[in-house]
């Protein structure tokens, strides 16, 4: 999973 407009990196693989 990846978040763009949250608090993580734009290409953060979760």
From Swiss-Prot:
Localization: Secreted
Keywords: Secreted
Signal peptide: none
Cellular component annotations (GO), alphabetically ordered: extracellular region
Tissue: Expressed by the venom gland.
Main localization, broad class: secreted
Positions of disulphide bridges: none
Miscellaneous comment text of the record: Both alpha- and beta-scoliidines are the two major peptide components of the venom. Cleavage products of these peptides have also been found in the venom but are not shown here.
Family: Belongs to the bradykinin-related peptide family.
Name of the protein: Beta-scoliidine
The organism of origin for this protein: Scolia decorata ventralis (Solitary wasp)
């Amino acid at each position: 999973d990846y978040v763009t407009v949250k608090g993580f990196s734009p290409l953060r693989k979760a």
